[in-house]
């Protein structure tokens, strides 16, 4: 995907394409600080090329972005039109991708999302369950606040947008914030995961979660603290499909298999 010719060849070989949804991304927030060129190659350059190809084919293009394009929040929620100011390389590369996509395909729709999890391993839900199986307690930050997003909900939203021209035109500025419900802290999300883990039989007993602050952890990348996306536009357009409280059990049950 970091080679334009190869990317175009793969897209051409895919046969007739009615829409293109770009879910490819470099998402390792920590490693991006030392792999800046690769992060920008995937999140910015490749995104722009994919958008340009879609524009050339005259087909809809939907692109995923992130809440990390914003800094620490100083109000309740970030609106789509609020000024961006990323705090780390990952966020900078995703913001550059937004700009590249918009230039290459002005009719594109960019979906910003946050805290994505699914049934697949490697996300926050499964990491919490793994730690809770062996640790007497977990220490989690309580000053990082956001909205969890169930990956299938996000995929359904993107597919619907790609298929519905009227809906795309209704999205203001081609920017949409999407997640699966209410905001909470990382610590509280971990507690919810553990509670459901016990209910679903993935965990034998509940493990206490101890609150801490982000400054107690040494990390290469700085994370925004209160970074909550305003999803009122998605709700008004009827794009929202569900709540993370309802879908979290699906992800937790998958860890049992």
Can you describe what each PLM-predicted range is?
Residues 157, 164-219:
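Mid/C-terminal beta-alpha module of Rossmann-like enzyme folds, strongest
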Residues 20-24, 61-66, 71, 111-113:
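SDR active-site strand-loop-helix element
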Residues 1-42:
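NAD(P)H-binding glycine-rich loop region in Rossmannoid oxidoreductase-like domains
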Residues 99-160:
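NAD(P)-dependent short-chain dehydrogenase/reductase
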Residues 242-257:
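Amphipathic terminal alpha-helices
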């Amino acid at each position: 995907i970091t080679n334009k010719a190869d990317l175009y060849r793969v897209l051409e070989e895919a046969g007739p394409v009615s829409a293109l949804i770009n879910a490819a991304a470099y998402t390792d927030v920590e490693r991006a600080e030392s792999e800046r060129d690769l992060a920008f190659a995937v999140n910015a350059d490749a995104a722009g090329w994919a958008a340009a190809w879609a524009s050339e084919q005259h087909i809809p293009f939907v692109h995923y972005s992130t809440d990390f394009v914003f800094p620490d929040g100083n109000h309740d929620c970030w609106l789509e039109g609020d000024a961006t100011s990323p705090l780390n390389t990952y966020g900078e590369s995703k913001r550059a991708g937004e700009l590249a996509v918009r230039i290459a395909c002005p009719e594109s729709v960019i979906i910003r999302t946050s805290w994505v999890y699914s049934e697949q391993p490697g996300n926050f839900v499964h990491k919490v369950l793994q730690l809770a199986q062996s640790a007497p307690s977990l220490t989690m930050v309580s000053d990082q606040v956001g909205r969890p997003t169930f990956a299938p909900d996000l995929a359904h939203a993107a597919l619907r947008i790609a298929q519905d021209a009227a809906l795309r035109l209704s999205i203001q500025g081609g920017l949409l914030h999407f997640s699966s419900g209410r905001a909470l802290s990382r610590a509280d999300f971990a507690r919810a995961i553990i509670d459901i883990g016990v209910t679903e039989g993935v965990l034998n007993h509940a493990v206490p979660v101890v609150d801490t602050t982000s400054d107690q952890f040494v990390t290469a990348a700085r994370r925004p603290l209160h970074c909550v996306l305003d999803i009122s536009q998605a709700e008004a357009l009827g794009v929202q499909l569900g709540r993370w409280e309802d879908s979290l059990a699906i992800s937790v049950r998958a860890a049992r298999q």
